[in-house]
Swiss-Prot record:
It catalyses: L-glutamate + ATP = L-glutamyl 5-phosphate + ADP. The lineage of its organism: Bacteria, Bacillati, Bacillota, Bacilli, Bacillales. Keywords: Amino-acid biosynthesis, ATP-binding, Cytoplasm, Kinase, Nucleotide-binding, Proline biosynthesis, Transferase. This is Glutamate 5-kinase. One of its GO terms (biological process) is L-proline biosynthetic process. The gene is proB. InterPro entries: AceGlu_kinase-like_sf, Asp/Glu/Uridylate_kinase, G5K_ProB, Glu/AcGlu_kinase, Glu_5kinase, Glu_5kinase/COase_Synthase, Glutamate_5-kinase_CS. NCBIfam families: proB. It comes from Listeria monocytogenes serovar 1/2a (strain ATCC BAA-679 / EGD-e).
């Protein structure tokens, strides 16, 4: 099935805050520049690319020199407002170095829940892609309360990226994280942890491995990634979870190399488009 990834034309790339920021709260400019280069080159190759990016609050905290993330919703939304503007400025600068135009698309869950607004979003994304523009999608943190309260509607944009992938009928969602893939145990504490190369079904056993509340492995981060993977698989789409510290790994994925964990239902192999 990995070989079929070479045929992927429309890609959604999701990058999380942990990939965009250093642990000390500063912006990881090296990773962002590499990401801009990789995605711009994929466009040069003829691929259609959508970037789903977190990081508004993290970048806002850096811009405003806040040592810790604010706890109140109004403060978080104010920080997100500053951070989103700064984040797009950084993206525009780096993508511009490679001659690639980007466009901002901010979404909230209700927009994708209602048919008319969902259709508008689809039309906007299609229009951007037709013009060779890379849409940069983020949740609109200045108005979206649920994620800020950690009732996780989108869960650091994990689910949002899967929803976007379905909206545009993407061939592949690549989720760049701070972990190499999906493991049977915590690789940071278990030196013998084994990574899954491919998962064809999200079973209760797989969910249990991701960890739940109170487990030392999961704070919910991996669970939201599994939810996104399940959403993709139910839509007959493929998702790869891999480490985003070096975005050039995307080139290797597109060559069919065994990188990260591929989530794909078995029925996906027999999809109607004949490319798989």
């Amino acid at each position: 099935m990995r070989e079929s990834l070479k045929n992927s034309k429309r890609l959604v790339i999701k990058v999380g805050t942990s990939t965009l920021m250093y642990g000390n709260g500063h912006i990881n400019l090296r990773t962002i520049e590499k990401l801009a280069m990789v995605l711009s080159d994929l466009r040069n190759e003829g691929k259609e690319v959508i970037l789903v990016s977190s990081g508004a609050i993290g970048v806002g905290c850096h811009k405003l020199q806040l040592p810790v993330r604010p706890t109140s919703i109004p403060e978080q939304q104010a920080v997100a407002s500053v951070g989103q503007s700064e984040l797009m400025h950084i993206y525009s600068k780096f993508f511009g170095e490679y001659g690639q135009v980007v466009g901002q698309v901010l979404l909230t869950r209700d927009v994708t829940d209602f048919p008319i607004s969902r259709e508008n979003v689809m039309n906007t994304l299609e229009s951007l892609l037709e013009r060779g523009i890379i849409p940069i999608v983020n949740e609109n943190d200045t108005v979206a309360v649920e994620e800020l309260e950690h009732v996780t509607k989108y869960g650091d944009n994990d689910l949002l990226s899967a929803i976007v992938a379905k909206l545009v009928q993407a061939d592949l969602l690549i989720m760049l994280s701070d972990i190499d893939g999906f493991y049977g145990s915590n690789p940071s504490t278990d030196p013998d942890a084994v990574m899954f190369s491919e998962i064809n079904q999200i079973t209760p056993e797989i969910e249990a491995l991701a960890g739940g509340k109170g487990s030392k492995f999961g704070t919910g981060g991996m669970l939201t990634k599994l939810s996104a993977a399940s959403y993709c698989m139910n839509a007959n789409q493929k998702m790869i979870l891999t480490n985003g510290k070096n975005p050039t790994i995307i080139f290797d994925i597109m060559q069919g190399e065994q990188i990260g964990t591929l989530f794909a239902s078995k029925k996906e192999e027999f999809s109607h488009d004949g490319t798989h």
